[in-house]
Curated annotation (Swiss-Prot):
Region feature (ACP-binding): 247-251
Cellular component, GO annotation: cytoplasm
Pfam families: ACP_syn_III, ACP_syn_III_C
Lineage: Bacteria, Pseudomonadati, Pseudomonadota, Betaproteobacteria, Neisseriales
Gene symbol of the encoding locus: fabH
Record pathway: Lipid metabolism; fatty acid biosynthesis
Entry's free-text remark on domains: The last Arg residue of the ACP-binding site is essential for the weak association between ACP/AcpP and FabH.
Name this protein carries in UniProt: Beta-ketoacyl-[acyl-carrier-protein] synthase III
One BP term from GO: fatty acid biosynthetic process
Active-site residue list: 113, 246, 276
Source organism (scientific name): Laribacter hongkongensis (strain HLHK9)
Main location group: cytoplasm
Biological role: Catalyzes the condensation reaction of fatty acid synthesis by the addition to an acyl acceptor of two carbons from malonyl-ACP. Catalyzes the first condensation reaction which initiates fatty acid synthesis and may therefore play a role in governing the total rate of fatty acid production. Possesses both acetoacetyl-ACP synthase and acetyl transacylase activities. Its substrate specificity determines the biosynthesis of branched-chain and/or straight-chain of fatty acids.
GO molecular function: 3-oxoacyl-[acyl-carrier-protein] synthase activity; beta-ketoacyl-acyl-carrier-protein synthase III activity
Domain of life: Bacteria
């Protein structure tokens, strides 16, 4: 049975940067207040008319180039997003068309900030089962369009961006284990319950979050799933080289690192400059650390994501 291994990574960030200082001109907040509570210093915003598929496509091109393959060899496209271009069809088919891959299976996965981990595990299962040999997995969001810019509790948190990986079959190593979980009992602590109905938008069109409840849930859930993911692969905390976590809040990241007994210089943190990009955050962070040389071939990585639903997931892999 083949492994699924990361052949290449890629990412894309929109040009517009919104700093905390600039944000403080819109709502009652300060740079110091935001940094002390979240670790975020700035975030990227998609331009007017720039869609999630535009970000996803650019990240995909960079991942394909890094993998050193022809796009035509890709046999599946999965896009994790909460902010699709439209209700339907999927954002994945838009990316598929732009890549010129007619006929290749393409679909979206919606698990909010855990979306990339769900898409990653799905692609891994297809490769492990021998159904395909290569998959393009993308996390892309324009979450800034779901934000109430008058609500300082949420407008400080989110940014736009996309990250992608190409997975390929490998006989020697790759993804060692994955774990996915969800608990709908906590669906109301982080949500955006808007929905189209008879030509109008019903429900609240903006993100709502109970910050303290989310923090409490996330810290325990991420610690627990890390233990399970390591155990499934016969590994321990001491074996880990890197943690690549969802970039939501620095205190959550630090709590996970402490649980894993990892120093922070072995944790990939892009939160200060990216903010929370939801499904894009894990592949964005991974690509940043691969491209700057921190993460090297053969190292053992733990990837983790968690978001509304509640849904969370992880993967242990040799890069």
């Amino acid at each position: 049975m083949p492994y699924a291994r990361i052949l290449g990574t890629g990412s894309y960030l929109p040009d517009t940067i919104l700093t905390n200082t600039e944000l403080a001109k819109r709502v009652e907040t300060t740079d110091e207040w935001i940094v002390s509570r979240t670790g975020i210093q700035e975030r990227r915003l998609a331009a007017e008319g720039q869609l999630t598929s535009d970000l996803a496509y650019r990240a995909a091109l960079r991942a394909i180039e890094a993998a050193g393959i022809e796009a035509a060899s890709i046999e599946m496209i999965i896009v994790a997003t909460t902010t699709p271009d439209m209700v339907f069809p999927s954002t994945a088919v838009v990316v598929q068309e732009r890549l010129g891959l007619a006929g290749v299976p393409a679909f979206d996965v919606q698990a909010v900030c855990a979306g990339f981990m769900y898409a990653f595990a799905t692609a891994n299962a297809f490769i492990r089962s021998g159904q395909i040999k290569r998959a393009l997995v993308i996390g892309a969001e324009t979450l800034s369009r779901l934000i109430d810019w008058d609500d300082r509790r949420t407008c400080i948190l989110f940014g736009d961006g996309a990250g992608a990986v190409v997975l390929g079959a490998d006989e020697d190593t790759g993804i060692l284990s994955t774990e996915l979980r969800a608990d709908g009992r906590y669906k109301d602590i982080l949500k955006c319950d808007a929905r189209p109905s008879q030509g109008v938008l019903a429900g609240n069109p903006f993100v709502y979050m109970d910050g303290q409840a989310v923090f409490k849930f996330a810290v325990k859930a991420l610690a627990d799933i890390a233990e399970v993911t390591l155990a499934k692969a016969g590994k321990t905390k001491a074996d880990l080289d890197w943690l690549v976590p969802h970039q939501a809040n620095l205190r959550i990241i630090e709590a996970t690192a402490r649980h894993l007994a990892l120093p922070m210089d072995k944790v990939v943190v892009t939160l200060p400059n990216h903010a929370n990009t939801s499904a894009a955050s894990v592949p964005l962070a991974l690509d940043a650390a691969v491209r700057d040389g921190r993460i090297r071939r053969g190292e053992l990585l733990l990837l983790e994501g968690i978001g509304g639903g509640f849904a969370w997931g992880s993967a242990l892999l040799h890069y």
